Amino acid sequence: MLTVFGTIALDTTRTPFHTIERTLGGTASFASISASNYVFTSIVGIVGHDFPASYLELLKNRVDIRGLTISQTGKTFHYDSSFSYDLSKRTTNKTELNVISNYQSTIPEEYVDSEYVYLANNDPSQNMNVLKLFSKPKLIICDTMDFWIMNRRDEVIKMINKVDGIILNESEAKLLFKESNIFTCARLLGSIGPAFAVINKGENGSLLFYDNEFYPLPAYPTEVIRDPTGAGDSFGGAFIGYLSQQEKLDSKSLKNAMMHGNIMGSFAIEDYGIQKLVNINADDIKNRYEKYKEIFSF
């Protein structure tokens, strides 16, 4: 079983072409729904009394929600952001932490023996605390963001030291080490403790650092881009979901996991919020994977 810990949010996303208000979002939502295409997935997080019943049902249909706390006294985490014309830059308009500000995470007894744990972008101290609740996972992967790097860098470093792998984007990696070279960043990530590091570069693909080697992978070519919000979390969910089905962790399985991460990220950006991810099936993923291999085979 895979357990995903992170935020479940109501997102307001503004692009030059469309605005969607208070739609289902959050790091754990995207990551868990993406991962559920590969492995039985459970989710740990908190929502407020204003969380729509329809979103609760949507999550319930895709993942195990016994680890989801519903507060009767507070509101759901709300994130309001705007994208630039080319959708490459996002500006935060408003962040309302609400119920997550004082959230003390717990997990159901059934989750304790989870073999796979994904710590989605969240407060690094909360991530480390929830990690203590699991018995002995086979694989732990984490994510982070610029906010935590700028304000809690030491805790981010400690968190990275406790996991098997880390996924973050190019700007975050450069910020973490105050280093302009992405390859140097990847090597430095590996030196902290994890067995592998993945740096996502958006439309320029991804870079894997494993066993002292670099493995770059181009992005899946996508012409329809509506909302990039959940791309990274969808990548992470698919990445660990795919690895959970493999017999061993090696360069081959990691490279294939990166392909599946890019594929699920490419699906996520084709519609607003979570809409695309909940409307694809195994055949859609398989067809895109085969096309991906065909494009990049010489």
Predicted regions, residues:
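Active-site metal-binding loops of divalent metal-dependent hydrolases
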Residues: 6-8, 234
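Short, conserved phosphate/pyrophosphate- and ester-handling motifs at nucleotide-, phospho-/glycolipid
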Residues: 35, 169, 232
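Extreme N-terminal starter segment of soluble prokaryotic enzymes
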Residues: 1-3
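Short beta-strand scaffold segments in enzyme catalytic cores
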Residues: 33, 78-82, 205-209
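Conserved N-terminal subdomain of the carbohydrate kinase-like
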Residues: 10-22, 37-119, 132-137, 286-298
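Conserved phosphate-binding/catalytic region of the ribokinase-like
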Residues: 182-298
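Histidine-anchored nucleotide/phosphate-binding helix
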Residues: 26-36, 131-132
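Conserved beta-alpha-beta core of the PfkB/ribokinase-like small-molecule kinase fold
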Residues: 116-187, 205
